[in-house]
A protein has these predicted regions:
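Ribonuclease/tRNase effector modules and their secretory precursors
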Residues: 1-85
């Protein structure tokens, strides 16, 4: 299951564009287009449950102290949304 990491900073950014964390998270289930950017983040064009089409800029959260799991049981790094509009 996809996990998201939200902090006050990115919540304020999406709120300024009239979006909630729930809407942005749900948009990950309705993706029209996604591409990797030069900085390693992703730019995604998607749709919220209400039908609003949005751009979401995100990356996998950086976890420096994670030890590789020889059995492959590590959960994918959480999604850190940089902004959505």
């Amino acid at each position: 299951m996809r996990q998201f990491k939200w902090i006050e900073w990115n919540l304020e950014k999406i709120d300024a564009h009239g979006l909630s964390a729930d809407e942005v998270e749900a948009a990950f289930n309705r993706v029209f287009h996604i591409e990797e950017r030069k900085d390693g983040s992703f730019q995604m064009f998607a749709q919220t449950p209400s039908g609003r089409r949005v751009w979401v800029i995100w990356r996998h959260d950086r976890v420096d102290d994670e030890i590789p799991d020889a059995f492959g049981d590590l959960i994918e790094a959480p999604v850190f949304v940089i902004t959505a509009y």
